[in-house]
Every structure is written in C-alpha cells, then in structure tokens.
C-alpha cells in the first residue's frame, strides 16, 4: 500500500514478487519507515533484525511464548522475533522500556485528516482546483519533510482527473493514517468495505 519514493506504485517495479523484505522497504514513501520498524533499525534500544528461524515468539493472546509458527530451522538464538517479520513503530512510545508502561497521546483529529477530507469533498463534487491539489500536497510534502511548494523534492500531485485523484487520495489516506483506526470508516464511506475486506 505504500508508494515508492517517486510516487509510483511498488507493484509496477520489475521483480517485486521475489524481493526480500528489506529490498521491498528501500526507496519507499517515508511514511512506511514511520509505520513499521525497518530491518536493521535501532528501535527502543535494540537493533531490529527479525529471524524466521527462531524457536519461540511471544503470543500476547495467551500471555506467553509459543512455538514460532514460521519456524523453518531450529535456531540457536531467539531475539525479537515476530510472526510476520513486521513490528509496528507508529504510535509506540519509545519510553515503554523504562517501566513497560506507556502513555501514548490520544489522537482526536489530525490536521492531515482535515486537509484530506477537504480534498475528498472537492474531488467527489468534481470541483477540483488548485486548493484541492494544495491540500493533498501539503500532507504528502510533510511526510517528505519539505514545504509543499518544493515540488522538486517530493512526488507532487498534479493531475486534475477526478478518477485519478480519487485513487491517489484513497492511497494517501491509507499511508497517512496507518494504525490510526480510520481505514474501516474510509472503506465504509467509499462503499468498498465488502469488496476490500473479503478478497
């Protein structure tokens, strides 16, 4: 769901089906690295290096270690495994290691959501103008750490096609609000939940 850094789709990249996960994460929209812990990244004081050959993984549903369902080879060491190889970064308080408790902020509404709601309304009304593109580009530019006017430093949205903008906006919301519990409401509003959730 995360685009490439140049704004193109990952699945348009030749050989994407056979890439190692670390390769899949390279040269992606910066929001990917803010959503999950990339391999080889220091997170909460530990360099994250997932291994699928670990013997045990923590199962929070039962509150104990269980045999790793992804176990392929018996491992001599077991550290920081996960069933999928993915660990969530977004919304995780890095201070949790102090006392294993966290007090994360509760998001009521983000400015990015306001901007994308505005753009979505303009797109659905087919009243696409400069303000529509600016709203979307402000969100995308923030992710790249630049001003929305610096269009040479991020893949600025320039199309004015209603159908293309609808697709871009939906992808943008998926990337921007990962792990923020808004996706289900987007799918319901767009009337595509049944199709998307029953693939």
Segments and roles (model prediction):
Residues 1-199:
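Acidic/polar-rich alpha-helix caps and helix-coil junctions
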């Amino acid at each position: 769901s995360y685009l490439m850094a140049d704004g193109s789709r990952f699945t348009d990249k030749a050989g994407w089906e056979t890439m190692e996960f670390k390769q899949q994460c390279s040269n992606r929209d910066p929001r990917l690295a803010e959503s999950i812990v990339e391999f080889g990244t220091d997170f909460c004081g530990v360099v994250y290096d997932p291994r699928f050959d670990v013997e045990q993984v923590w199962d929070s549903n039962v509150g104990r270690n269980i045999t790793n369902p992804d176990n392929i080879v018996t491992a001599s060491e077991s550290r920081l495994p996960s069933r999928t190889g993915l660990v969530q970064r977004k919304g995780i308080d890095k201070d949790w290691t102090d006392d294993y408790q966290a007090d994360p902020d509760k998001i009521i509404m983000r400015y990015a959501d306001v901007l994308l709601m505005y753009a979505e309304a303009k797109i659905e009304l087919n009243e696409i103008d400069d303000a529509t593109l600016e709203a979307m580009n402000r969100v995308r530019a923030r992710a790249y750490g630049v001003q929305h006017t610096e269009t040479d430093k991020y893949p600025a949205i320039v199309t004015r096609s209603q159908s293309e903008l609808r697709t871009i906006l939906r992808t943008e919301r998926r990337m921007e609000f990962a792990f923020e519990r808004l996706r289900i409401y987007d799918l319901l509003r767009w009337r595509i939940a049944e199709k998307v959730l029953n693939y």
